[in-house]
Amino acid sequence: LKDKFSFISSRISYSELKFIIKTLCIIPFMIIHVPNKNTLIIDDFKLRCCIGKKGLNYNKKEGDYSTPKGLFNLKKLYFRKDRIGIPKCKINKKVIKRGMAWCDDTEHKKYNEEIKTRHKSLKENLYRKDHKYDYIISISHNERKIPGKGSAIFIHLTDSYEPTAGCVALKKKDFEILLKLIDRKTKIKIG
């Protein structure tokens, strides 16, 4: 079967293969693909992105500056209504307000989930002065909340394409293209 697939895929273009797969409904959902450190592909769009400064890693650990490899669900869009209004998209969404954070304390019971900043734990503030978190999409990395396996892995904004601490980041105009294409069934394949 592998040889047959290699034979077929060597004779048709990526676009043709994608059309065939969509037509046959083999994959009934959209896939965002991040194949390397500076490319994000969705539908017919190839967008520039940046990832963790230590590259892609199947064995993600808290604070290692790598981006986890794998296939993940998109969970929720968080956004700054005061800066960008209410975006139109087909995934669950939530307004980022003062006092919202994400727990990255491996010893805390709320590890890798949204919290209030009043919690006495290590956390990533979601309400920021810069524009990096004007849009955030949380993904299903480490949903079982295994301490030390990584937290706060998002798709968020960048203005410089500097490497991240482990997230995938896009320019605002590209993020807004992404928002128009995704829905609740969309997955992100990293690596």
What do these predicted ranges mean?
Residues 2-19, 25:
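Low-acidity, Ser/Thr- and Arg-rich intrinsically disordered low-complexity segments
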